[in-house]
Amino acid sequence: MKNIFKKLLIFMALLLFSCSPDNLTNENETITNSDSNNPGILKTSTSKISNTGTSKIWNFDNLTEWEDATQVGNPNYWIENGNLRIFANPNTWERSKVKTISSFAAGTYRWTVFVPEMGVGDMASIGAFLYNNDTHELDFEIGYGKQAIRDQLAAEPDDLIVYMTSQGYPFQSVQKKIKRGQWYNLTLQLTLTSNGRYTVSWKINDAIMATVQLSYGKTTKFKIYCSVENLQFIGDQIPQSQNYALFDAVEFKGI
């Protein structure tokens, strides 16, 4: 009888140990552990949660996470003193571009870019834009501008024209003047309405310049582009100068 009682006690102890809270996993729980270098900081296990927010900044010390997107001509860009220098040559229709390897959705996109003096009348554009396809594209494009647009905006000799465009759904293009030879923060802010569609705002140095409600939303993701392209819509002559831009940083903050 003693042997049976002893075996029963052992069995009950084993059963209690196997069911202790430390060995049970709740799929809805967040598992944490201490950082060995900072014991007071708790880390959250990403295996149990889904984090939809993303934050990225590229300072252009290199082109990691970017790839060539040049359409015409040679890839005319390199890293120079912590900036991406990108250009297009005169008397060509070169279209020099880089894009992110990854795609992104709702959030705030910011380019820090130096806009130099550009050739008078040149059909050349500095681009900071988001692209999915030809109708799902959101742009900043900066150039000398056609004379008709310059006249309409009463542009001074040291003014350039920035085109802020949604290429479709709906199409909208707004033009404003900016001064050449300056650094700018160009921001595209994509927020979501209650039905999951995007509202996009174009900002220059944090001042809102244009806004539009799009008919598409969060299922459409974009790659981020930096470019200098010779394009016919933005001037009155094939470029006579080598036009360039400097990109100091690109940033994305997801929501």
Protein language model regions, located:
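Short tryptophan-centered beta-strand motifs in secreted/extracellular beta-sheet-rich domains
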Residues: 111, 182-192, 200-202
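Secretory/extracellular carbohydrate-interaction modules
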Residues: 88-158
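Extracellular glycan-recognition surfaces and repeat-rich motifs
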Residues: 62-84
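Beta-strand-rich interaction surfaces with strong enrichment in secreted/lumenal proteins
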Residues: 95-102, 172-178, 214, 236
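Bacterial Sec-dependent N-terminal signal peptides
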Residues: 14-50
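Ligand-recognition surfaces built from glycine- and aromatic
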Residues: 108-110, 216-255
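Short carbohydrate-recognition loop motifs
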Residues: 76-92, 158-162
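Short, aromatic/His-centered strand-loop micro-motif at the edge of beta-sheets
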Residues: 163-185
